[in-house]
UniProtKB/Swiss-Prot annotation:
Protein encoded by which gene: THRRS
Protein name from the UniProt record: Threonine--tRNA ligase, mitochondrial 1
Cellular location(s): Mitochondrion; Cytoplasm, Cytosol
Molecular functions (GO terms): ATP binding; metal ion binding; threonine-tRNA ligase activity
Any one cellular-component term (Gene Ontology): plant-type cell wall
Lineage: Eukaryota, Viridiplantae, Streptophyta, Embryophyta, Tracheophyta
Pfam families in the record: HGTP_anticodon, TGS, tRNA-synt_2b, tRNA_SAD
InterPro entries found in the cross-reference section: aa-tRNA-synt_IIb, aa-tRNA-synth_II, aa-tRNA-synth_II/BPL/LPL, Anticodon-bd, Anticodon-bd_dom_sf, Beta-grasp_dom_sf, TGS, TGS-like
Amino acid sequence: MLLRLTARSIRRFTTSSSSLPLLSSSSFCTVPTMAANHPKDEAYLSAVIPKRIKLFEQIQANQLENLKSLPHDPIKVTLPDGNVKEGKKWETTPMDIAAQISKGLANSALISAVDDVLWDMNRPLEGDCKLELFKFDSDKGRDTLWHSSAHILGQALEQEYGCQLCIGPCTTRGEGFYYDGFYGELGLSDNHFPSIEAGAAKAAKEAQPFERIEVTKDQALEMFSENNFKVELINGLPADMTITVYRCGPLVDLCRGPHIPNTSFVKAFKCLRASSAYWKGDKDRESLQRVYGISYPDQKQLKKYLQFLEEAKKYDHRLLGQKQELFFSHQLSPGSYFFLPLGTRVYNRLMDFIKNQYWHRGYTEVITPNMYNMELWQTSGHADNYKDNMFTFNIEKQEFGLKPMNCPGHCLIFQHRVRSYRELPMRLADFGVLHRNEASGALSGLTRVRRFQQDDAHIFCTTEQVKGEVQGVLEFIDYVYKVFGFTYELKLSTRPEKYLGDLETWDKAEADLKEAIEAFGKPLVLNEGDGAFYGPKIDITVSDAMNRKFQCATLQLDFQLPIRFNLEYAAEDEAKKSRPVMIHRAVLGSVERMFAILLEHYKGKWPFWISPRQAIVCPISEKSQQYAEKVQKQIKDAGFYVDADLTDRKIDKKVREAQLAQYNYILVVGETEAATGQVSVRVRDNAAHSVKSIEDLLEEFKAKTAEFV
């Protein structure tokens, strides 16, 4: 096995970093440690920690010995600006290159990319290469710091509680990290956080290097034999897969990495919350404790984030949904939401908005079944790869499944008769109800549900049409996200090591996607080797008003399903049959999830065109109630959502209640307005008042909605 470490990277975990100042525990967001009563499995710790460290050091020493026999030939390292640095094969590390550039860069670079592959800063280079260095202000740097912080968290948890660690990744939402562990009967709470944070501070102060080795499957099983969860993970790995193990201080953990240079780069650490979880999300498996955390390279950023969290709590979509009477969930149908009349208005308006765009962009809407015989899912591959996430049942001794996605049904539509090249591109849109069997512990408001709808569409086109269709989808996404007030970024994920189809088709598809993005004029982030095995994809990450990131839209080329369903069309040479390319795309993604994102993005203040409470008429007294009802009817007949407050409350109280309910327009009417056929208009968040005729007001309403529905 080839060595992946330098001699200096095998320092003992108590050795301080020579290039970075030590971190005091006061730099962490902690309070004095409280003596939380908890059992600690000392026997487990005394058995596993020394054993793992001993095995790690033995394997590491063997790899170090192997390194000595390898040729340390000169290599050229090319930086993004074109500059070339000299180095030695199997000796020079990205950290060495960073130090050549500047001391400041060496003190702040968290991770590198070698020929577009993420690489530890202290891992030797293996030949001539392109090298990029990333700090915390990049996605790659941030995610690496948080991934490494999960290991620091795991170390603190294991040392404090003697728990069996399970998995500890960055969160999928891109805000921090967590670690799952098995604690027996112990349930963690906020009271345990001070001691956990103290353990993390201790690890950071020691500047423990993150050290990497490669192991065989047998070595991994021996190393983690006392942890049944790790053993299960290892046994599930492919036989030919390279297994990597990382160490920081006393923690030796199964991990593919990469990681930051050492623990002292984490200068601010905070536990956020604890919850229960099931092993592998299966309610029939072991109950685990999950601790969420956040970390930063300085205290200022942590303080800013904690302030943001307090602000975000006020606008949690679950709270706003209840307050505005939009939706609710019920224990008799977990993961499937009830949308109340006001919430249904927003839900339908979102779909109408997309349908209006479909009309102008050449999409054809279809309706497909909700359940299919399992034979369909076997053809599509879902039976082998996705069945655990499906709801299945038997009808007349045959197995059926509720659809988790629309693509196989759309393949049947394409397949059901002979197709010609003249019909392409064929853009099929579907708002069909989808069901996915999410674990109960994973359900989270509208953002993680079991029953949902998507603005799902699939484009069947020729190879020559791919570039134009992709550009059209990007323009569609851009228009919608600008309406919502989102910013976004594009990431192109290219061919993985294992892929379906021929190399020429992949190369052309990737080139078409790159050209489409370049023509679109949006910056591109390249994720080499991160595409699906059935085709390259473009990931679209949006940022909302609070600068949180979400992945909603999808754009995926698929070479597999057309083959699985044997889809063909008659080419211009009618004697010849050709295979279409299939493009999966969604703009909103899950309508439920987009509903939640928009509710929080707007902080409950819906724009007029999508608002469930567009206007309310408030009569000053009983004398003007009849006129108020007349105004309400005129506005309603014009197709707008309008209410009337006919209570006997004073007008100031009516207006105040309407403001709190987030009505876009508050229309006050009294005897004067009744006599002139006008209304006194108050617009939300605008102190100025005006008087308008009903006709002028309706024209204003129409102008605010015409573009969208």
